[in-house]
Amino acid sequence: MIQPLVKASRPRLWVCSDCLLRRTLSPLLRQQRRRFTGFTAHAPKTLTGTIPVTHKNGDTKHDDSLLRSIFDSPETWKQFSGDKHGRNVGLFRNAYLTSPHGFLDFAHVSLGKARALVDKVLNAQSLDEYRAIVRHLDRLSDILCRVLDMADFVRVTHPDQQIQRTASMAWDMMYEYMNQLNTMTGLYDQLVQAMDNPQVSTTWSEEERMVAEVLKLDFAKSAVHLPKDARDKFVHLSSAISQTGTNFIQHMEPKIPYTTVEKSRMMGMDPVEVKRMASMGKVYVQTLSPQASIALRTVRDDHARHQLFMASRTASRRTVHTLEELMLLRGESAKLSGFESYGHLVLHDRMMASTPESVRQFLQALSENTRPQAQQEVADLTAAKRAHKGGDATLEPWDKDFYAESIRQAIKSRQKREDLSSYFSLGTVMQGLSRIFTRLYGIRFVPREPMPGETWHPDVRRLDVVSDVEGHVAVLYCDLFYRPLKSPNPAHFTLRCSRELSPHEIAETAHTQAENPHVLIPSFESAEFAANDGMAYSRSQDGAIKQLPTIALVCDFPQQSHNRPALLSFFQLETLFHEMGHAIHSILARTSFQNVSGTRCATDLAELPSTLMEYFAADPSVLALFARHYETDNPLPYEWVDNKIREARRFEALDTENQIILAMLDQELHSSKAVQGHIDSTEIFHSLQRQFSTAPPDPQGTAWQGFFGHLVGYGSTYYSYLFDRVLAQRVWNVVFNSGQGGAALQRENGERLKENLLKWGGSKDPWKCLAGALKDERLEGGGEKAMKLVGSWGGQRGTKSDQAV
């Protein structure tokens, strides 16, 4: 997701998979493939691991029609989803997960496999054993992540609290073991010894060498290379950082909890809402509330807006102190690990920027590019105020939202009120996404009947992703409808990454029951299924077995009814396209090693595919594929979309400028200033505003940075959102020719992006991937010059009618 740049606080080190050398199948394994007697199974024939390739037009048309119907028609879905009283196949078809306790069984079995791999790595002595170390460590990552990622998803998504609890217990068990591994010096020493031996490292593939570097960096971030005293201090600091970050988020508070305003000064705001907050002629507005934001956009009285603005931009002294304490702890931790600052530490690891100076070059170039349009927008706001107030009134900080809203409302009043959502039924949108991916990448969505126990709620649809060349390539679970207590936040979850399984790994499954006498191992119909825990896999023409990416998309769209399908707003359409961008990255980047599969690429590249999909959501040729009225079947008039985008992006340059300043603040707070033992976050923020803001800066006495919660989860990487937005615009303009002449749907353009960038995941230098996709040699080496170049491209999207080719 930054994913995106987003999305979940998952552990970084042991997160991904394993790819083993492709070897000739042993006679034992061939025998087991004929009938895997170790786990005689009576699974139904529908539990196949693969789907054959089909080129029949009839099948494609049927799948396309059915895809729309299962999302738009409750009756069709009820008939298609079938009988749920058969044999329970387990959640996600993981055969261990047929009951709440199954999570604990799955965790125990996985821990046994993990410990066996750790022993192999620690006891490696021969050249062959050292050559296998990267594969073993990557498989170790996959074993832990099979539990961690599924359990993490289930504990926040599953409606059954008992299953949530056991999933949390399984997660805790694996996370505790993962933390032990992260500081295990023996594993680090063995990896370094393998990397430093040319007789070992020269036999590795490029992908294998990339995984080795990733693992080494992750170990280094855990201070495993330091003396014991330093390691102990690092562990203590890490705990303090975690606790302080949690305190900052949970106890964030304004200096003034409520702002008291004379009721007579609240004209312009919804009178019903004002009355609800009023008492004895006063209005009491909670400082950090939606009502405060609405008031800043609608209340006409300058004095009232000034009061509300000052309160909403001023965090309490305690909150600011906690933030600064967090920055100092991070600085101390980075210094202990041998880095100049926390920013240097973070950017050293799987980031295209590599250094804080590169980030500054990008942000300053982007600021220069954005300034002319931002100045024009400030001039428009000032003109609106003067038209309202008369004379030579100047724009104040508390005026910006009010006059921006008045200009947007004026745009709306000149336009007919269009019902865009009637053209975006969820079924037609899913149908459209499948058609887009078919044209660009040769893959489509095929509805698959969920088996008993496979999904966590009856509303969840399973789609198999089928390639016209490779057959079944991924599994996609769609949990898209609203239900009580469900998280409203849209998200993409990778439940399992791509990974190639070795013949020896598959053969090992015959001993699973003997190695786990206290756990009842499920029955499987083959060794391949056993190695995949019952989940989907594919077999290539050369016989290689790969576990398939398994993905969940979660949204909060309105439920369909018997007489009307679920209809999406344009914002919801963009959201679904964005999340599907993450999914397509996971689907296309089916690498052999899990550590570099799918979205496990450079962190500041992860949001590029998802942000790019937002351009497709606004392209007329793309919308023509599916956007039709759910009752009349009339096509969507594109000018309605153009008007909607124009309204939404009216002050995009000022919004971008604000994001630039926040990204700069993130860099400054994580710079060497935090290593020196004192940091004044308020002065840093105000100084950046004075230097880079075209809009009026916050007045003295405010301290908005105390509300910047993203500093906890995105420390020193907040720039990534802007970076990927600029890159997405460039890819759209260069690779897809801004959609001109139907370029958004041309297969050669999709193949260009896939072959140069998407299919590699994190297995190739991202700058080389980007240079190949854009055919721009200036990017190949990366560094400060490349970052500055990207910043100079700018990031204002505009609308189709004013977009440059």
Swiss-Prot record:
UniProt keyword annotation of Ion transport present? no
Q: Name one GO cellular component term.
A: mitochondrial matrix
Lineage, top-rank taxon, reads Eukaryota
Location relative to the cell: Mitochondrion matrix
One example GO MF annotation: metalloendopeptidase activity
Protein name, please? Mitochondrial intermediate peptidase
Instruction: Tell me which SUPFAM superfamilies the record gives.
Output: Metalloproteases ('zincins'), catalytic domain
- Is this entry keyworded Transmembrane? no
Q: Which cofactor does it need?
A: Zn(2+)
State the similarity comment: Belongs to the peptidase M3 family.
Do you know which Pfam families this protein is assigned to?
Answer: Peptidase_M3
Question: At which positions is Zn(2+) bound?
Answer: 578, 582, 585
Catalytic residues at 579
Co-factor binding comment: Binds 1 zinc ion.
Q: Which parts of the chain span the membrane according to its record? A: none
Q: What is the role of this chain?
A: Cleaves proteins, imported into the mitochondrion, to their mature size. While most mitochondrial precursor proteins are processed to the mature form in one step by mitochondrial processing peptidase (MPP), the sequential cleavage by MIP of an octapeptide after initial processing by MPP is a required step for a subgroup of nuclear-encoded precursor proteins destined for the matrix or the inner membrane.
EC numbers on record = 3.4.24.59
Q: Name one GO biological process term.
A: peptide metabolic process
Alphabetized, the UniProt keywords read: Hydrolase, Metal-binding, Metalloprotease, Mitochondrion, Protease, Transit peptide, Zinc
**Which top EC class applies here?**
hydrolase
Instruction: Quote the transit peptide annotation as a residue range.
Output: 1-25
